[in-house]
């Protein structure tokens, strides 16, 4: 019995252990399946939320195309291009997915959100491909021309400086929740015991000045701030959220004054004269894997705070001319040209010279112009080219300069392929951007002492320097230029005097109006005004004119924007540390008291206003603090912004493998020629001006301070003539269809490197080498890529049908849906389908036919009754009249009267002919 009892107990224990083991294993399996399904569900839910918000945004924009509000206009022109948009959408889906999981996290253990789960979320959301390093090509071409995306400039860090990567952080960001919420998001959050002042209050009390009160710069021309804006658009664009509606709840950001991501509205004071309590503001897109997304990587909430993305290459590479992605570059190039030209406008000329081509988007209309005749915006490497005529003029100058250079290079080197001529011209244009910026522009901004301290002489490429544009530079320091924008656009005649037919214009009358350039004199009057009229001087107490603080992007009476408030709010959105933190970063003393602040600002009244608003010196927004500082000697910035701008410019120069002064980028002789060139020379070669100042940025009087274009030095392009002997065994082949090649040397041998146009895939050898027997392989071919076959990352939204075309694809909508502004999503147009109109028309015809038939039947019946009561003679007469009237256009009634020789009597019966 004891043995049986012991065996029974043993069996029970073993059974219990096995049962518990089974239960635990099953729980792990079940929980694993539950977590996986939960992740998939969270991502699917988030994708629906984000896409629904984006869809509603595009639908609202479609309905409001006639009159855009300033906020809509700003949002539209900060829309990311295709690649940037895909990254922004993926980041928003990933961030929303993690928010969904955080809200439901009580159902799961905290440690369940592992790196594996996060990898799954990154993959399902579409973020993962944009977080991996790109593959760098290993060809001689990779060392000859910079890639359009900026990737692989640094071979060890291929994403440094590339487009669609996160802005660099020189100091950790400050977010109210530690990783994502902007400064000022929570109204009860205190900084050193005080809430931050509303940005609109800061603008009104410290920044804004009337147009009449501005002081003009006695040293520098209006070209100085315009060049600064142009260069800023070459190196930085922070895309806004792809949606202007909240992801949770879908409320329109223009209709809410609550903080609901991505809505972060600018609150207006209670005594504001406007009809709304806030101005719309949309948060910048997060970079993939940061903010709420980064909060769960390793479960370290502060390990990877929210970062913002730069949609452009960081490098000074003339991306304003060529774009920062293959898709944009494809739109800009003239693929039918054998000389590697850029596309030009086919509808308008400027005294025989080219304008920028038109984009598909319509800009602000000329008064009284119907929508169908609205002038489109200009198409350039940067989407903001049409903001103001001066900016469009500079873009146009460089379009013309590229085509001038490419044509000359092709004439000098007839054996060059179209792609070689294009790349060589692009290389020179990029070098000229670097020279004009670093030699002529930046020293005037920093002053000689700060330039020597922070930039200094060039000592060669340094692969340890990260050239990525920093958040503080893009979001604060380089926005100093907004305080130098003049409220007037001055257009001058050939004598550089006020143009009688082209009067001065206020800025509000030129925003996004390219028709003013085309229909009102072309480039020359604008360029003369930039050269011969002064910039606005940045003066404490006169920081920004009211055209920018009260009338920004105003096209109608449907609202306004305030650029100063936008700058301050953007800094808080990006979590920029305060003014004193950045002074300490630059080795400058912290300023804690009004007396200390007055040493840097040197304006007691402004210091008092700052302290009244901010209450504590460590609360001051960095953009305001840097802007308010007194200038350094010979500079146009104070010490803080001189430090930040100088450090950034040095990084852009020293961290760029393709910097024009770097060894092997150009020959020694070519570098000497490049140094001769200047912005005035570019103006001489590409406008109708015959006299220019030697320095385009210095204000001068005409004619004594202007030189003849014949005396302005220029490059000798003969230095680009290729003289290497071409072996008869290796004659340059014909260019491949839908592709091109460039040539270079590798180990002393001639090499051809082939590439296909965007939308085509290379099949065969990418690189062909010249040997003793000729080319070592046949040229490759370029095959069309069927983008529609990609089911993993479909190019069109599910609402659209994908149609493959040669080198591209089209997203097609069924009536009454139309493509949204992303050209991938079908939006309900709000009108009846064409088929419905056809049905209505057919129905109307059917009803009309039935009515006519009914009328004829009734008339016949009535006529038959009348025939029975008429005398024989009357009946015969009437029918006779009807027969006579046929074919002559005479009414039967009148014909009957003619037969009797009488006019028809009033009120007599009119008989119907059969």
From Swiss-Prot:
The record's free-text note on cofactor binding: Binds 1 Ca(2+) ion per heterodimer.
Pathway(s): Hormone biosynthesis; thyroid hormone biosynthesis
GO cellular component, one term: mitochondrion
Compartments (UniProt record): Membrane
Main location: membrane
Domain of life of the native organism: Eukaryota
Example GO molecular function: heme binding
Chain positions covered by the region annotation Disordered: 881-909
Ranges annotated as spanning the membrane: 835-859
GO biological processes: embryonic hemopoiesis; hormone biosynthetic process; hydrogen peroxide catabolic process; response to oxidative stress; thyroid hormone generation
Residues bearing glycans: 123, 271, 299, 334, 603
Topological relation to the membrane, as annotated: Single-pass type I membrane protein
EC nos: 1.11.1.8
Segments in the Extracellular topological domain: 32-834
Post-translational modification: Heme is covalently bound through a H(2)O(2)-dependent autocatalytic process. Heme insertion is important for the delivery of protein at the cell surface.
One matching Pfam family: An_peroxidase
Cytoplasmic side: 860-914
UniProt cross-references to PANTHER family, sorted A to Z: OXIDASE/PEROXIDASE (PTHR11475), THYROID PEROXIDASE (PTHR11475:SF60)
Homology family: Belongs to the peroxidase family. XPO subfamily.
Described function: Iodination and coupling of the hormonogenic tyrosines in thyroglobulin to yield the thyroid hormones T(3) and T(4).
Identification of the protein by name: Thyroid peroxidase
């Amino acid at each position: 019995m004891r043995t049986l009892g012991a065996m029974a107990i043993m069996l029970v224990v073993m059974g219990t252990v096995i049962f518990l083991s089974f239960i635990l294993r099953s729980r792990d399996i079940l929980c694993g399946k539950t977590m996986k399904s939960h992740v998939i569900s969270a991502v699917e839910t988030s994708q629906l939320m984000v896409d629904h918000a984006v869809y509603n945004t595009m639908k609202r924009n479609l309905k409001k195309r006639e009159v855009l509000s300033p906020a809509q206009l700003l949002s539209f022109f900060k829309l990311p291009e295709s690649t940037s948009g895909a990254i922004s959408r993926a980041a928003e889906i990933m961030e929303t997915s993690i928010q969904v999981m955080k809200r439901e996290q009580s159902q799961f253990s905290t440690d369940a959100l592992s790196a594996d789960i996060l990898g799954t979320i990154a993959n399902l959301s579409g973020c993962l491909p944009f977080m991996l390093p790109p593959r760098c090509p290993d060809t001689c071409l990779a060392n000859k021309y910079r890639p359009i995306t900026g990737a692989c400039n640094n071979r060890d860090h291929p994403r440094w400086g590339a487009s669609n990567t996160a802005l660099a952080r020189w100091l950790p960001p400050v977010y109210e929740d530690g990783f994502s919420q902007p400064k000022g998001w929570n109204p009860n959050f205190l900084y050193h015991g005080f809430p931050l002042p509303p940005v609109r209050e800061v603008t009104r009390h410290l920044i804004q000045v009337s147009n009449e009160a501005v002081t003009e710069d006695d040293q520098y021309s209006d070209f100085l701030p315009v060049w600064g804006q142009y260069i800023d658009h070459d190196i930085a664009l922070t895309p806004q959220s792809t949606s202007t509606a909240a992801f949770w709840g879908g409320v329109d950001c223009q209709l809410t004054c609550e903080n609901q991501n991505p809505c972060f509205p600018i609150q207006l004071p209670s005594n504001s004269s406007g009809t709304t309590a806030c101005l719309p503001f949309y948060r910048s897109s997060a970079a993939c894997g940061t903010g709420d997304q980064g909060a769960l990587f390793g479960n370290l909430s502060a390990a990877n705070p929210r970062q913002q993305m730069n949609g452009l290459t960081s490098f000074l590479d003339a991306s304003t001319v060529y774009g920062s992605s293959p898709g944009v570059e494809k739109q800009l190039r003239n693929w039918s040209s054998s000389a590697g030209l850029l596309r030009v406008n086919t509808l308008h000329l400027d005294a025989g010279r080219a304008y920028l081509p038109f984009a598909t988007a319509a800009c602000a209309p000329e008064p009284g112009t119907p929508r169908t005749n609205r002038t489109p915006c200009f198409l350039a490497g940067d989407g903001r080219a049409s903001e103001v005529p001066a900016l469009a003029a500079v873009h146009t100058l460089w379009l013309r300069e590229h085509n001038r250079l490419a044509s000359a290079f092709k004439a000098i080197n007839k054996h060059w392929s179209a792609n070689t001529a294009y790349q060589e011209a692009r290389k020179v244009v990029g070098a000229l951007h670097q020279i004009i910026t670093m030699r002529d522009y930046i020293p005037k901004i920093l002053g000689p002492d700060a330039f020597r301290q922070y930039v200094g002489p060039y000592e060669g490429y340094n692969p340890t320097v990260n050239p990525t544009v920093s958040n503080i530079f893009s979001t604060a320091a380089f926005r100093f230029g907004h305080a130098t924008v003049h409220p007037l656009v001055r257009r001058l005649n050939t004598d550089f005097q006020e143009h009688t037919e082209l009067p001065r214009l206020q800025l509000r009358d030129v925003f996004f109006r390219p028709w003013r350039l085309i229909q009102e004199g072309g480039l020359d009057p604008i360029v003369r005004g930039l050269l011969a009229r002064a910039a606005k001087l940045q003066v404490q107490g006169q920081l920004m004119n009211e055209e920018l603080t009260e009338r920004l992007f105003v096209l109608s009476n449907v609202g306004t924007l305030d650029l100063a408030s936008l700058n301050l709010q953007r800094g808080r959105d990006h979590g920029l540390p305060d003014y004193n933190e950045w002074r300490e970063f630059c080795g400058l003393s912290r300023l804690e008291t009004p007396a200390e602040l007055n040493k840097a600002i040197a304006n007691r009244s402004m210091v008092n206003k700052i302290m009244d608003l901010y209450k504590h010196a460590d609360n001051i927004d960095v953009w305001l603090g840097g802007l308010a500082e007194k200038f350094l000697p010979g500079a146009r910035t104070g010490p803080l912004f001189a430090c930040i701008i100088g450090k950034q410019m040095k990084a852009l120069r020293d961290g760029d493998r393709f910097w024009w002064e770097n060894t092997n980028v150009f020959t020694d002789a070519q570098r000497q020629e490049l140094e001769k060139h200047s912005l005035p020379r570019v103006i001489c070669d590409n406008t109708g001006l015959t006299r220019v100042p030697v320095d385009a940025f210095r204000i001068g009087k005409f004619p004594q301070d202007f030189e003849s274009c014949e005396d302005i030095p220029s490059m000798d392009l003969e230095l680009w003539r290729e003289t290497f002997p071409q072996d008869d065994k290796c004659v340059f082949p014909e260019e491949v269809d839908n592709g091109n090649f460039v040539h270079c040397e590798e180990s002393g041998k001639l090499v051809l490197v082939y590439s296909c146009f965007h939308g085509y895939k290379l099949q065969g050898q990418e690189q062909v080498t010249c040997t003793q027997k000729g080319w070592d392989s046949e040229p490759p071919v370029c095959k069309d890529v069927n983008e529609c076959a990609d089911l993993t990352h479909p190019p069109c939204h599910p609402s659209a049908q994908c149609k493959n075309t040669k080198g591209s694809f089209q997203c097609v909508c069924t009536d009454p849906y139309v493509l949204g502004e992303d050209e991938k999503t079908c939006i309900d147009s709000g009108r009846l389908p064409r088929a419905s109109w056809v049905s209505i028309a057919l129905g109307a015809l059917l009803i009309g036919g039935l009515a006519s038939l009914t009328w004829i039947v009734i008339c016949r019946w009535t006529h038959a009754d009348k025939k029975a009561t008429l005398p024989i003679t009357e009946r015969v007469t009437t029918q006779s009249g009807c027969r006579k009237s046929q074919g002559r256009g005479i009414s039967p009634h009148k014909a009957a009267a003619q037969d009797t020789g009488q006019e028809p009597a009033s009120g007599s019966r009119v008989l119907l002919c059969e």
